Amino acid sequence: KQRLANLEEANAVLEARAQERYEAEKAAYEAKQREREEKTRKPRGRKPKPPEAGPRDKDQYNFTDPDSRIMKNSNNSGFDQHYNVQVAVDQESLLIVAPSLSNHPNDKKEAEPTLDALSPKVGKPKAAALDNGYFSEANIAALEKRCIDPYIATGREPHHKIWRTYFKQLPDQPPEEASPKVKMAYKLQTEIGKAIYRLRKCTVEPVIGIIKEVLGFRQFSLRSLLAASGEWCLVCLAFNLKRMHTLYQAKGLL
């Protein structure tokens, strides 16, 4: 009976996840359609296919830790059972000011929860730089609503730029009716946009690297979303204590 009850629970969870995925894919599909319609030239490539509702053959349920999800591993060599961790990092001190954790594979949903995790005691950031995995109109609106100037990449940057890109002139400012994606792409090409976004690479990425390589944290010991969230907060606290020791030492206070 218990096995049957577990299977029924798993089926209900898969149905709920499928509906959540369908709604997210539908919103993304509608956004792509709007973007195609806004273009003055005839769009290239095939029209995006509308999403299909319901569970898929490859959908899985983990009985050991039902809260975790199948996600791409860090080196993109396959898929594992994971949680999605996030940190907001202060650019000047390199201290973690907001940790968050979820079971959403897509980072687009993670900007707002991380912003919500920011305590008023640490102050309000003037600007925020995020990579292209976070780009969405909703995230731009969420940052602007909090009076935070957003700088979100609209696409992947090539690792090795050709020399012509360094001498490329700034294009004309897009019209007011241009899409948020076009406006953001222009914003990131301005001098201030390039300067702020450049700082992201030496702010968040070193923190994640230190957590993995120096603190040695690469997997969770606890199960469930709540327990894993607590464990992630402890890891971020450990990083901050280590970082504060370095900062105090540099000022001759230790």
Predicted feature residues:
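Anion-binding and metal-coordination hotspots
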Residues: 1-254
